[in-house]
Amino acid sequence: MKQVSDASFEEDVLKADGPNXVDFWAEWCGPCRQXAPALEELATALGDKVTVAKINIDENPQTPSKYGVRGIPTLMIFKDGQVAATKIGALPKTKLFEWVEASV
């Protein structure tokens, strides 16, 4: 899973080939930590269809502000430099996989 920052977001996500699922998270967020293993599995299982990235909102406040992230965890699918889908809140693994597969 790729770690991105405010400085690398444009290059790593917006200009990337193929879709990206970006997890907006924070160290202090319990639901974020709970879902991390499912995101790791997603990155491995669907790595040929989507790149999974994480951005820590405390260390990188500009990007979540730009995309209107109000609660975490927030997952966004980016395609061709645009937000294609957004999901706020933790999802069970099966729902996460279904949502990402339907969105990419």
Swiss-Prot record:
It comes from Rhodospirillum rubrum. Belongs to the thioredoxin family. One of its GO terms (molecular function) is protein-disulfide reductase activity. This is Thioredoxin. Residues 2-104 form the Thioredoxin domain. GO terms for cellular component: cytosol. InterPro entries: Thioredoxin, Thioredoxin-like_sf, Thioredoxin_domain. Disulfide bonds join C29-C32. The gene is trxA.
